[in-house]
Regions:
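Bacterial N-terminal signal peptides
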Residues: 12-23
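Short, surface-exposed glycine/acidic/tryptophan-bearing loops
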Residues: 28-33, 38, 81-136, 159
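A short alpha-helix/helix-coil micro-patch that ends at or immediately precedes a cysteine
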Residues: 30-96
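Surface-exposed patches in mature extracellular/periplasmic domains of secreted proteins
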Residues: 48, 70-84, 96-108, 153-161, ...
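A well-ordered secondary-structure block
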Residues: 108-184
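Asparagine-centered strand-capping/turn motif at beta-strand->loop junctions
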Residues: 193-203
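A short, solvent-exposed beta-strand micro-motif common in secreted/extracellular proteins
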Residues: 228-242
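Structured interaction patches on ligand/partner-binding surfaces of diverse proteins
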Residues: 239-267
């Protein structure tokens, strides 16, 4: 019996978009690791166990949601557009035996957008596995998810509370026998938190959104959009019912905050 050979590799990326009326800002964390596999004279063992790749992708989604449930996270919903993006990229990695989030010259955000997915957040996990003895469907699915679970950056994507949808692709290289898996996660643009602030007071007001400071002149309205649940703090402004101190809120989609002056001095904040 020939000795068993097992190899694996994992990469993760998170892409988030931060929106204000103008300008639009984007923040991307993108590892530039790149590997190209050269099997030399090695030929994949065609007699080795062969998993069902479509069922492996389904298993990865199921195991991911089970892992999220154990950590009090909501389940991710399968999205066809994310699934196509993930499968197309897995096929590319397998066809070229390359390993990088930008192996095809594109960012994950570009790949999902090309499939028509309008996102507020996108995250991606990729990995490859090899075992000379092959894998069953169950073994391969568990190998991928176990590897991601034990990697801090991949684990962060698996458990991100602000992600809502998932697509998974799995492919096998005919040249090297490596199995490649891609997880694309998303929060759709439709779930962005959009809220407004109107200054009806007689002077400029100051506030922060997620720690970033803003000043709003009288009679102006500003619209903020965030992909993650924001924190809003008005400095030196009292919320209705507050006896003292600054007014703090957790805005929801569609909220409208109006700041008004008070006869006795100071300001009040009304949320609708």
């Amino acid at each position: 019996m020939s000795p068993r050979s097992t190899h694996r590799r994992f990469l993760a990326v998170l892409i988030g978009c931060l929106f204000l009326p103008l300008p639009v800002l984007a923040q991307v964390s993108e590892p530039q690791d790149y590997d190209s596999v050269d099997p030399g004279n090695h030929k994949p063992d065609v007699s080795a166990s062969s998993p069902d790749l479509a069922k492996t992708a389904e298993l990865i989604t199921r195991l991911t949601n089970q892992f999220r449930a154990r950590h009090n996270r909501h389940a991710l919903t399968k999205n066809d557009r994310l699934s196509r993006a993930a499968q197309d990229f897995a096929d590319y990695l397998a066809r070229t035996d390359t390993f990088s989030h930008t192996a095809d010259g594109k960012q994950p955000s570009q790949r999902v957008r090309a499939q028509g997915y309008e996102f507020c957040l996108v995250a991606e996990n990729i990995a490859w596995e090899y075992n000379s003895a092959g894998f069953t469907t169950k073994e391969l699915g568990h190998a991928f998810v176990t590897g991601w679970r034990h990697s801090p950056e991949h684990r962060k994507n698996l458990l991100d509370p602000d992600l809502d949808e998932i697509g998974v692709g799995v492919a096998r290289s005919k040249k090297s026998g490596h199995y490649y898996a891609v997880q694309d996660f998303g929060r759709p643009q439709s779930k962005a938190v959009v809220f407004r602030i109107t200054n009806e007071a007689g002077s400029t007001i100051h506030y922060t959104v997620d720690g970033k400071s803003f000043a709003l002149d009288p009679h102006y309205t500003v619209t903020h959009q965030r992909c993650r649940a924001p924190e809003l703090d008005f400095q030196g402004v009292r919320g209705k019912g507050d006896s003292e101190g600054d007014a703090a809120f957790e805005p929801h989609k569609g909220d409208h905050f109006t700041v008004q002056g008070q006869r006795q001095g100071g300001y009040s904040v009304d949320k609708k």
